[in-house]
Amino acid sequence: GDLPICGETCFEGGNCRIPGCTCVWPFCSKN
């Protein structure tokens, strides 16, 4: 159950594994 990294698919409101990335559906992106 690892969190997605930048560039991977995520769910709205979800978290990303790497600090400085946020979930902007449908992908984790750098802030």
Swiss-Prot record:
Gene Ontology biological-process annotations: defense response
InterPro entries in the record: Cyclotide, Cyclotide_sf
Disulphide bond pairs: C6-C21, C10-C23, C16-C28
Alphabetized SUPFAM superfamilies for the sequence: Cyclotides (SSF57038)
Pfam families reported in the protein's UniProt record: Cyclotide
Keywords carried by this UniProt record: Disulfide bond, Knottin, Plant defense
PROSITE patterns: CYCLOTIDE
Post-translational events: This is a cyclic peptide.
Cross-link type Cyclopeptide (Gly-Asn), residue numbers: G1-N31
Purpose of the protein: Probably participates in a plant defense mechanism.
This protein's domain notes: The presence of a 'disulfide through disulfide knot' structurally defines this protein as a knottin.
Family named by the database record: Belongs to the cyclotide family. Moebius subfamily.
Protein's name according to its UniProt entry: Cyclotide glopa C
Protein species of origin: Gloeospermum pauciflorum
